[in-house]
């Protein structure tokens, strides 16, 4: 009982009181996890033989055997396993290496925490023997791995052995289920052990006091251990080359872990800063949203009023625009049809003159002239219909329009028609008169344009100036339609 108290007291110094018992109870879970990763071909399933809490030495032996046999099985199935299984085997090797390093650390930790009594030497000797056995097992493991390289070429034998391994795996799965049942039993015992934590804590406090007195004696034993380690150093040098590779990998992993920890700390600081900024922004957003809600209410009221006014104006403008657009389109089509008719008539006249000269082609030209006459009749009929529509639209426009404004397209059409009409045609004078009324020319400009002479300018005062531009425009269109 005294030995157990001293051991638990040393563990209490390096770990918290509550975590000590949890660590001893959770060791079966680690053993089961190692079995799941690297299942040895032979494992005792006797529940009485297996302890609930395995000692570090037993764990080291079991793990070394598991490593040995798992590496052999991995060597047998290298050529037949797919790339995913190769990756899994590599992961298992890494886990085995980590288990070996952990066991070494536990052994060194155990050396540091051993009590200075007569049993210490025996236990130290046992630990050294176990370490030597572990090293011999490790050497045998390496020799077996090197010997298995020659077997890789034998694919048929490897496949047979793979089938045997698969059968063993089924057995191991059944053993794994048994171990899981043991784990459940350990969990129940864990609940019972937690009840004893209070009593153990009191004992640990007493043991800590005893430990302080034994530390001085422990220093002497450490000096003796150092002498033994010097003797051990010659043996370790043989394995230093292989261990250096593992240490380099471990150092690289430690550096990566440190870098990741630094990155995590920086990220935590950044996250805290961002959270404070987010809270400030949320407060500002809430205040802005309140102001925005007030402004939205006022804006909605204003927008409703503006929409009502705009809708009224848009409806009026649309009606006027539609009327003007319809008039423009009709006017443009009328002008185009009129120009086409004039061109067709001129071409027909030329053709008729040519037909008089060529008597032999008379019949052919007569048929063509008849077709053209029919087309001209159709075009005139369409022009009459369009003129009727125009007169009706202009009459409606004359009634509805109060303003004397006309857009730029109308002015451009008037100018084009003025330029295209020949000088002898009286329509040119009418178009010029429309432009003068639209642009509100005075008498001087009209005289310069040739609309009125000096005598007519005196009599122009008697003419009524109240006649609007729209009325002149409608009269002009009516005259054009009558001529057509």
Curated annotation (Swiss-Prot):
Alphabetical GO biological process terms: endoplasmic reticulum to Golgi vesicle-mediated transport; Golgi organization
Gene3D superfamilies from the UniProt entry: 1.10.287.1490
Key word Transport present: yes
Modified residue annotations for Phosphoserine: 55, 64, 468
Compositional bias per record (Basic and acidic residues), positions renumbered to this chain: 16-30, 61-72
Keywords of the record: Coiled coil, ER-Golgi transport, Golgi apparatus, Phosphoprotein, Transport
Chain residue ranges for the region called Disordered: 1-75
Recorded superkingdom: Eukaryota
Subcellular location: Golgi apparatus lumen
Gene Ontology CC, one term: Golgi membrane
Pfam families: GRAB
GO terms assigned for molecular function: GTPase binding; small GTPase binding
Positions of the GRIP domain: 401-452
Residues in coiled coil: 84-383
Composition bias type Basic residues, residue spans: 1-15
Domain remark in the UniProt entry: The GRIP domain binds to ARF1, which leads to the Golgi localization of RUD3.
Additional observations: Present with 7620 molecules/cell in log phase SD medium.
Purpose: Involved in the structural organization of the cis-Golgi and in vesicle targeting/fusion stages of ER to Golgi transport.
Protein name: GRIP domain-containing protein RUD3
Protein source organism: Saccharomyces cerevisiae (strain ATCC 204508 / S288c) (Baker's yeast)
